[in-house]
């Protein structure tokens, strides 16, 4: 299985003046997955580090990258902007791609999946194409919408499965909602 995509993230965007290390615009967060409202559906919640009630309750966070992209193989224009959530292996590969190819919004990338959808053994290969002009939409802010940013009180409610999710606002159930005709929940693979 494969997809031809255009990323909405440039990759390397500069250098940290204090460390000299490259800075990237990939949205990479330490997050928790849990059913916050008793619906039976896991949500993504931003980890608060040392003050995180979810960590204290034994819910281990994981480092995740949330890549927004245009899936050029998708025929329905309303579903072309998609979100792809990846882990550490793909974070390293994306950093390698930007180091080698520069601004990733300037070229299409063919992504090839080896393995079954949903399998932990599935791997992905990335094949950047020649640079070409294409207008891409701006990447959406995910923290506060798809990634819940909860205060201590709401973290405790989430642990107990009794957080009230509302339409709009920080605890919004935006995973299936549309922003400007684009759904944040469309998945590539």
Predicted regions located by residue number:
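Hydrophobic side chains in beta-strands
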Residues: 69-71, 111-113, 128
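Elongated alpha-helical scaffolds
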Residues: 100-118
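OB-fold/S1-family single-stranded nucleic acid-binding modules
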Residues: 114-144
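Charge-dense, intrinsically disordered terminal/linker segments
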Residues: 115, 159-160, 174
């Amino acid at each position: 299985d494969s997809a031809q995509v255009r990323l909405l993230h440039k990759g390397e965007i500069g250098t940290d003046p204090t460390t000299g290390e490259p800075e990237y615009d990939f949205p990479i967060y330490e997050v928790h997955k849990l059913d916050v409202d008793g619906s039976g559906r896991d949500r993504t919640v931003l980890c608060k580090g040392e003050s995180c009630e979810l960590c204290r309750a034994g819910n281990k966070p994981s480092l995740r990258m949330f890549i927004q992209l245009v899936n050029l193989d998708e025929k329905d224009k309303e579903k072309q902007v998609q979100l792809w959530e990846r882990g550490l292996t793909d974070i390293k590969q994306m950093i390698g791609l930007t180091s080698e190819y520069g601004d990733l919004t300037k070229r299409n990338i063919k992504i090839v999946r080896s393995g079954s959808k949903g399998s932990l053994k599935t791997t992905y290969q990335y094949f950047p194409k020649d640079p070409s002009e294409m207008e891409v939409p701006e990447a959406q802010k995910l923290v506060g919408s798809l990634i819940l940013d909860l205060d201590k009180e709401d973290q405790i409610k989430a642990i107990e499965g009794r957080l009230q999710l509302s339409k709009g606002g920080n605890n919004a159930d935006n995973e299936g909602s549309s922003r400007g005709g684009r759904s944040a929940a469309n998945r590539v693979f």
